[in-house]
UniProtKB/Swiss-Prot annotation:
EC number(s) reported in the record: 4.3.2.10
GO cellular component: cytoplasm
Recorded family membership: Belongs to the HisA/HisF family.
Pathway where this protein functions: Amino-acid biosynthesis; L-histidine biosynthesis; L-histidine from 5-phospho-alpha-D-ribose 1-diphosphate: step 5/9
Entry keywords, A to Z: Amino-acid biosynthesis, Cytoplasm, Histidine biosynthesis, Lyase
Identification of the protein by name: Imidazole glycerol phosphate synthase subunit hisF1
Catalytic activity annotation: 5-[(5-phospho-1-deoxy-D-ribulos-1-ylimino)methylamino]-1-(5-phospho-beta-D-ribosyl)imidazole-4-carboxamide + L-glutamine = D-erythro-1-(imidazol-4-yl)glycerol 3-phosphate + 5-amino-1-(5-phospho-beta-D-ribosyl)imidazole-4-carboxamide + L-glutamate + H(+)
GO MF term set: imidazoleglycerol-phosphate synthase activity; lyase activity
UniProt-listed Gene3D superfamilies: Aldolase class I (3.20.20.70)
Keyword Nucleotide-binding found: no
Organism encoding this protein: Vibrio vulnificus (strain YJ016)
Length: 257
């Protein structure tokens, strides 16, 4: 059995790490490189960096910090934000990232997933999915441009269908960002994770809602996710990654110590 992964998520805007609640009202957390280093030293299995303004601004991630991160950490990391072509992805991977993640650009051009998977291998290609539960319709909808409050919009895709579509096109891993839960810290949406897990045959990473150690255990035990991503609880030092791993081990969950 593969060890379950703990993945801190760093939202980057204008070269600094920021954090919002439900994708809004971002506050500055600090500089990228020291935070990345701290998480690697605490025992994170992997890091994810989202340039949250890149796609909505129509620009690619400013890559200078990617090389600086690669110099100070020895764990895999993934970079997302405005990657619209194989050239964009190649540049990020050359700077030292291990994976690239695409979200809004994949919705605009699903062929991009296939192009990247063919060129770099599926193991490098992560698709991020921003999923919102609409209480009125009772459906989970995929949203686009979530890094910009003014441009965020629902797409025609229901979450379950898009999960199946991106796998057909070559996604090697899926990060499910549950927008209703984001930054609220009251637990992952287990029901939604189970719905997605049923149709997801690639590694599935839960994102949005972690507030306590039990929430991580729940996602692994009740929804069989491969990894859990969190931001607020790590940035604000509510949870220490080393202690979290000891706790998970006590719960009988396989983790790398």
């Amino acid at each position: 059995m593969l060890a379950k992964r703990i993945i801190p998520c760093l939202d980057v805007r204008d070269g600094q790490v920021v954090k919002g609640v439900q994708f809004r009202n971002h506050e500055i957390i600090g500089d990228i490189v020291p935070l990345a280093k701290r998480y690697a030293e605490e025992g994170a299995d992997e890091l994810v960096f989202y340039d949250i303004t890149a796609s909505s601004d129509g620009r690619v991630v400013d890559k200078s910090w990617v090389a600086r991160v690669a110099e100070v950490i020895d764990i895999p990391f993934c970079v997302a934000g405005g990657i619209k072509s194989a050239e964009d992805a190649a540049r990020i991977l050359e700077f030292g990232a291990d994976k690239v993640s695409i979200n809004s650009p994949a919705l605009a051009n699903p062929q991009l997933i296939t192009d990247l998977a063919d060129k770099f291998g599926v193991q490098c290609i992560v698709v991020g999915i921003d999923s919102y539960y609409d209480k009125e319709t009772g459906k989970y909808q995929v949203y686009q441009f979530t890094g910009d409050e003014e441009r965020t919009k629902a797409t025609q895709w229901e979450t379950r269908d898009w999960v199946q579509e991106v796998q057909k096109r070559g996604a090697g891993e899926i990060v499910l960002n549950m927008m209703n839960q984001d930054g609220v810290r009251n637990g992952y949406d287990i029901e939604q994770l189970n719905m997605v897990r049923e149709v997801c045959n690639v590694p599935l990473i839960a994102s949005g809602g972690a507030g306590a150690m039990e929430h991580f255990a729940e996602a692994y035990q009740k929804a069989n996710v491969d990894g859990a991503l969190a931001a607020s609880v790590f940035h604000k030092q509510v949870i220490n990654i080393g202690e979290l791993k000891q706790y998970l081990k006590q719960q009988g969950i396989e983790v790398r110590l």
